[in-house]
Amino acid sequence: MKVLLTAINAKYIHSSLAIRYIYKNCQDLSCDIEMLEVSINNHLIDIANQIFDARPDILGISCYIWNIELVKQLLPLVHRLLPNCKIICGGPEVSYATKEFMQDFPMVDFVVRGEGEKAFHDLLQALLDDKNNEEIKIAGIAKRNSDDTIDENIAVTVSDLDEIISLPEEIVEQLK
């Protein structure tokens, strides 16, 4: 299974800590995880082509105030190009009105609400275990069921930060 974690940054010089933390915290899983970083200044078609060229089975997209309008344009396009790809959105722009977002974008299978390192990891593990959407019950994961109903789970916060694998210092230094 191939997973593509995608960040659409505000500027070319920005880097996403979010996808790096997700990547680092999912390293124990038996799947191929790649990261793609682009900026809101990239053309929509170019971003869609980069995602298509990666041929992910699962696409994770970080949604923030600076990229949400581009993400909303990108989702239907990616779904047309990769109709069997599971789409997972996360970030503050999809965490508060999750049900409405998922109703507006029926191609989105899951939304990670709140802190994503553990929730995304657990969701990937469930998908690797071939669980169907109805079987998946993970704190912080909203999901679309086979009958198109949407189950929202409360966003979670991590109370013990030692549960989250930190980025190595060399990666942090590279991002400065």
Indicate residue ranges for each PLM-predicted region.
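Residue-level signal for short, function-critical loop segments
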Residues: 9-11, 65
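Radical SAM [4Fe-4S] cluster-binding motif and immediate context
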Residues: 162-176
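Short beta-strand segments enriched in small/hydrophobic residues
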Residues: 2-9
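Short N-terminal binding/cap micro-motifs at the start of the first secondary-structure element
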Residues: 12-18
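Glycine-rich beta-alpha loop elements in corrinoid/cobalamin-binding modules
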Residues: 2, 18, 25-26, 32-160
